[in-house]
Amino acid sequence: MALTRKPNNYLNFEFYSTRGINYSSFSLTELYSFEHFSEIRHRALYSLGFFLCTTIVIFSNIKFVVKILKNSVSMIQF
């Protein structure tokens, strides 16, 4: 009789710190406070970068944006 492993419904997560230390031996699904702050910092920097790039693109094409707004306002009659 061959022994078979019963499949479980749990995912085996392994989280690695940014300093190269493996914390998965302590807890499989828990991030420590340093990793939380690091993740928040990365997301904030990506959001800021996206906002700055979008702002630069919009201001570089400001004449086109003003043209669209003027056309839409000129069609309104009071």
Swiss-Prot record:
Chain segments annotated as transmembrane: 44-66
Membrane protein topology class: Multi-pass membrane protein
Primary location: plastid
Keyword terms, alphabetized: Chloroplast, Membrane, Plastid, Transmembrane, Transmembrane helix
GO cellular component, one term: chloroplast membrane
Localization: Plastid, Chloroplast membrane
Family from the record: Belongs to the TatC family.
Protein's recorded name: Uncharacterized tatC-like protein ycf43
Organism ancestry: Eukaryota, Sar, Stramenopiles, Ochrophyta, PX clade
